[in-house]
Amino acid sequence: MKLLFVCLGNICRSPAAENIMNAQIDQAGLGAKIVCDSAGTSSYHVGDSPDRRMTESLKKRGYRVQGRARQFFPEDFAEFDLILAMDGDNYRNILAQDPAGQYHHKVKMICDYTEKFGDREVPDPYYGGQAGFEHVIDLLEDACGNLLTSLGKELVN
């Protein structure tokens, strides 16, 4: 199973989701069955490391942070089993790269997997303060945990 997390620039939300999910996958012993990556719908930050503020926030919670920003491309539809958008704008931008709708069934909103929060989108913390980064991590921990539970059931069946 291959998962792709997607936000705008691939320096805050989607790399956070990728690194949180990787930690949860490792903890569940599913590293051989689930592979994660992340991308951005824009090319603003291609090649950059994750945002320093997000990296610091993740490390404070014990996460290992790795990865470099890359852009989402139409080839990703065939490469990944599930593509998880952080917000509605990115969801629509992803779908726009598949005009025939062949892969629309693979694209979901990450917040569809949250249970503890009412948020329908993961807000972009880039221009906000520290509390915004913490809220994003809280949302993603919840969503990734529930997603992993769902995938674990699929992988067993």
From Swiss-Prot:
The keyword Hydrolase applies. Gene3D superfamilies: 3.40.50.2300. Its EC number is 3.1.3.48. This is Putative low molecular weight protein-tyrosine-phosphatase slr0328. GO terms for molecular function: protein tyrosine phosphatase activity. InterPro entries: LMW-PTP, Ptyr_pPase, Ptyr_pPase_sf, Tyr_phospatase_low_mol_wt. Keywords: Hydrolase, Protein phosphatase. Pfam families: LMWPc. It is an enzyme of class 3 (hydrolase). Coiled coil: none annotated. The active site is at 7 (nucleophile), 13, 124 (proton donor). It comes from the Bacteria. CDD domains: LMWPTP (cd16343). Belongs to the low molecular weight phosphotyrosine protein phosphatase family. It catalyses: O-phospho-L-tyrosyl-[protein] + H2O = L-tyrosyl-[protein] + phosphate.
